[in-house]
Amino acid sequence: MFENSNDIQLLSVPRDPRRYLVLIRAGSKRRPSFFSEIPQGERQYDLAINYYATPHPDDILRNRAEVVFAGGRSKMHGAKRFFEATGLHNIYEGVLFLDDDIEILFNPDAFFAICDEYSLDLAQPALTPDCIDAMGLTREHPGLKLRTTNWVEVMAPFFRRAFLKEMLHSFDLSISGWGLDLYWGHHLADRWTAGIVDELLMRHTQVSNHETGAFYSYLRSIGVDPYEEMKSILTMIDTNPYIARPIRFVYRTYSFRA
């Protein structure tokens, strides 16, 4: 049941969904993140866990998350199958998609509040400076609250409901995920706003290894070439290269009282 597959198996869904959803694609390892246990107190988000391998024995989310499902071929592929099966993308105001090697260093409600305040349709937290395989655009820029951009990385994207409904069809265009963020960025046009939130940080706890890493070994085993998938999407959007860039800067403010 807990394995990569073309289909998914739903194990639990909420009867009364909260405003937002945090969806984690997870395997058998211990997670380093905020979600090693269920957050205490009031929260405006549900937790969803999508397993591609048997959960770790200490994984509390297996029995305590509001949403549990198994299967899917990768993070966005599984998410598409889940939303097609449940229709919950029509209910949640926004969804944050995470891998299980992402450690978030903030309360998700604070992130959702910033996305709401600045009307971000597509967004991500900034990465800590010690993430050595991160693009410069996605690393924290000290002194900034956020930057609007024309691109958000597939690693941990947030989608507001309207943009999620618009882009859901694309989630299985690339099983590796390569190129999906270019597709989303291309379709922002003048209608949607994307941003990287510098005030709230996340850490990528594992360095991606395209040769020996478990995910890339899995992709080779099913005949998926990430470079070819990205090339296909660049052809699809008739843009090569795609230039990712910041657009507008929102600076942090500081108050002094006497």
Predicted regions and their residues:
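C-terminal catalytic/acceptor-binding lobe
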Residues: 1-11, 17-20, 25, 174-258
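A short acidic, amphipathic alpha-helical/loop segment
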Residues: 33-38, 81-82, 109-114
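Short, hinge-like loop/turn segments at secondary-structure boundaries
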Residues: 65-67, 140-143, 212-215
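A structural signal for short, well-ordered beta-strand segments and their strand-loop junctions
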Residues: 97, 122-126, 193-198
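Conserved catalytic core of nucleotide-sugar-dependent glycosyltransferases
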Residues: 104-181, 185-189
